């Protein structure tokens, strides 16, 4: 008989060590220009400046990570390094909280399960979930689910469950499968009680109303939106494409990247156990989740991805590992079967140990990837040039060829400069309010062609800075 009680703390330590190792090997060495927006937000918060509800230039994807990073940044740490660490903690916290409360309720096997699930996942999962890009901002909130469900007052529990599920969904829709499963499992014993439905709705409806007005406010901001949210569409063509390429959405979410050949047997085993043990609530939750996941394959937004760590399709289904824990912890499993399942998953996981981390710049990627040490060297060169020439404004042109490099370079230099000049990218400026600022003094323009430079001011001399051609202008 396995003694699961003794596994809890060793598994916690192993999980934290694994996460730290993955951070050190990749996320603290490689970044992209989408992450640079979160640097700016954390830097602004640390300096006491307000930030928008959503990522700059958008009316979706709430800023959550910068708020967690603001205090360390204010203490003097760089947001470039603080944010990946904070985001990795956000990804792990739900697993740790579910495990802690399972242990507290003497469900030691369930606690071990919650810790083993992330431990068995490929390196890609750790890398993707440590990117401050809003991938795990909604799932992170489900760390509050176990303490809410352990409240003694039933009606307060229902009210807070409705609030929590609605907030998580509004923050990021990739939480929907997990929210569906948890709501089914917690509400199942009370299906005939009207108060349960009323209190869940009483919690959820005000959240959706508030989200609507926050979105409207973002849409009415000066300068407009650079990236408005998608108009969601469901089509049979997308659905057929999704079904035939479903492994794209499972990438890095199954031990060893095994995808369907491992997932299907586990799904069949879980279904059989639900039927054999007469777990109707679990069977219904499983069916509801599968329906949500399969139908979602027909939505256009779900197909906005690449087979790449920095823009994965699987970011849409990041709830799957948490779903596995929520469903599997509720079935009774003989220790021999549990060991057999673990052994198969562990063998599969071995295939991803030491797998090479891809930081290559694939041509079809809609963002720029760069090593942080290379970015620092370029930023030092730009900073020296700015100080030497006493530049007041740095303008980036040449969209779309140079915009990723310029965002990374400008944002990194801005957060690391005591008295930074105004940095602006007129053709692709995320902080829309900067477009109304008057450009004055000595201007460094990078990228674009000479015709655009002349329109901005008098050319004093042409330069080449950080591999980009440009000019010094006088307004």
Language model feature labels by segment:
Residues 22-27, 66, 80, 94, ...:
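Aromatic- and kink-enriched transmembrane "portal" helix at the membrane-lumen/periplasm boundary
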Residues 51, 216-274, 299-306:
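Membrane-lumen/periplasm interface segments of multi-pass, membrane-embedded glycan/lipid transferases
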């Amino acid at each position: 008989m396995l003694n699961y009680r003794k596994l809890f703390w060793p598994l916690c330590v192993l999980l934290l060590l694994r996460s730290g190792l993955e951070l050190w090997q990749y996320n603290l060495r490689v970044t992209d220009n989408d992450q640079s927006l979160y640097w700016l937000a954390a830097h602004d918060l640390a300096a006491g400046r307000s930030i928008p509800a959503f990522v700059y230039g958008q009316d979706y994807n709430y800023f959550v990570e910068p708020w967690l990073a603001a205090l360390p940044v204010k203490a003097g740490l760089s947001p470039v390094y603080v944010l990946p660490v904070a985001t990795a903690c956000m990804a792990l916290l739900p697993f740790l909280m579910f495990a802690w409360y399972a242990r507290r309720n003497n469900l030691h096997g369930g606690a071990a399960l919650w810790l083993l699930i992330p431990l068995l996942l490929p390196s890609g999962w750790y890398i993707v979930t440590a990117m401050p890009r809003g991938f795990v901002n909604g799932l992170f909130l489900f760390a509050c689910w176990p303490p809410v469900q352990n409240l003694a007052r039933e009606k307060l529990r229902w009210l807070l469950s409705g609030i929590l599920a609605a907030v998580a969904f509004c923050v990021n829709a990739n939480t929907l499968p997990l929210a569906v499963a948890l709501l089914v499992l917690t509400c199942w014993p009370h299906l005939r009680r009207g108060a349960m439905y009323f209190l869940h709705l009483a919690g959820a409806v005000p959240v959706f109303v508030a989200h609507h007005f926050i979105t409207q406010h973002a849409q009415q901001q000066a300068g407009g939106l650079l990236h408005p949210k998608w108009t969601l569409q469901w089509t049979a063509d997308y659905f057929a494409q999704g079904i035939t390429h479903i492994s794209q959405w499972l990438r890095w979410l199954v031990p060893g990247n095994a995808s369907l050949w491992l997932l299907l047997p586990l799904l069949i085993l879980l279904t059989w156990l639900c039927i054999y043990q007469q777990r109707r609530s679990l069977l219904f939750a499983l069916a509801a989740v599968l329906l949500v996941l399969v139908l979602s394959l027909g939505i256009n937004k779900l197909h906005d991805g690449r087979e790449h760590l920095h823009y994965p399709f699987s970011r849409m289904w990041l709830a799957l590992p948490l779903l596995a824990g929520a469903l599997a912890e509720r079935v009774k499993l003989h220790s021999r079967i549990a060991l057999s399942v673990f052994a198969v998953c562990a063998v599969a996981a071995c295939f991803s140990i030491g797998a090479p981390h891809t930081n290559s710049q694939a041509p079809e990627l809609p963002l720029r990837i760069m090593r942080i040490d290379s970015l620092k060297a370029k930023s030092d060169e730009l900073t020296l040039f700015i100080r030497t020439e006493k530049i007041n404004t740095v303008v980036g042109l040449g969209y779309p060829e140079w915009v990723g490099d310029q965002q990374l370079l400008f944002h990194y230099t801005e957060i690391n400069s005591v008295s930074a000049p105004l940095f602006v990218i007129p053709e692709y400026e995320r902080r829309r309010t900067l477009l109304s600022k008057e450009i004055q003094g000595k201007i460094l323009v990078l990228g674009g062609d000479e015709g655009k430079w002349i329109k901005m001011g008098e050319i004093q001399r042409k330069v080449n800075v950080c591999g980009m051609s440009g000019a010094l202008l006088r307004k």
